[in-house]
Swiss-Prot record:
Role according to the record: Accelerates the degradation of transcripts by removing pyrophosphate from the 5'-end of triphosphorylated RNA, leading to a more labile monophosphorylated state that can stimulate subsequent ribonuclease cleavage.
Gene: rppH
InterPro entries (UniProt xref): Nudix_hydrolase, NUDIX_hydrolase-like_dom_sf, NUDIX_hydrolase_CS, NUDIX_hydrolase_dom, RppH
Top EC class, one word: hydrolase
Cofactor(s) demanded: a divalent metal cation
GO BP terms in the entry: nucleoside phosphate metabolic process; ribose phosphate metabolic process
Nudix hydrolase domain location: 12-156
Family membership noted in the UniProt record: Belongs to the Nudix hydrolase family. RppH subfamily.
S-S pairs: none
Keyword Hydrolase: yes
Protein's name according to its UniProt entry: RNA pyrophosphohydrolase
EC number: 3.6.1.-
Length: 163
């Protein structure tokens, strides 16, 4: 997967895949980041490895961050294109070894078919300190500011599924 699109910083975007995990009553999984001093919530997401499709990366990230395995989800939809965000200036050069100026993301809506007990955030490399099911409309306020537009667009893309 190439990171060929450049952001305003002149640095390429890091290819990433994300998951909007939806429970049977229409609430969305949100994890509170373990590495952020404030209450920063986000949905499962992460980089796409070389040779990996965005869908494969999304399913891998779901397992790595939540313990939810592919047999416990039904993939419902994919964002029609890449969604991008730029890192704020204070983070440029500090994350991802300074190689990227933001992310280009493909998002997947997935229906969670399991029980809440299948969610295990105490993974090998934990990213979340706690998790909850949230209304999509409430999720955006808890996201770090530089990702809010991405989340709003993704949730809008999946609005019919979330309704």
């Amino acid at each position: 997967m190439s990171a060929d699109l450049l952001g305003p910083s002149g640095l390429p975007y890091r290819p990433c895949a994300g998951v909007v995990l939806i429970n049977p009553v229409g609430l969305v999984f949100a994890g509170q980041r373990i590495d952020n001093p404030g209450p920063a919530w986000q949905m499962p997401q992460g980089g796409i490895d070389r040779g990996e499709s965005p869908r494969e990366a999304a399913l891998r990230e779901l397992v790595e961050e939540t313990g939810v395995t592919p047999d416990l989800v039904d993939v419902l939809a994919e964002t029609p294109g890449w969604v991008t965000y730029d890192l704020p200036p204070e983070l440029l050069g500090k994350v991802w070894k300074g190689r990227y100026g933001g992310q280009k993301q493909k998002w997947f809506a997935m229906r969670f078919l399991g029980e809440d007990s299948a969610v295990r955030i105490a993974t090998e490399h934990p990213e979340f300190e706690r998790w909850q099911w949230m209304r999509a409309a409430d999720l955006i306020d808890g996201i770090v500011p530089f990702k809010r537009d991405v989340y709003a667009r993704v949730l809008s893309d999946f609005r019919e599924i979330l309704a």
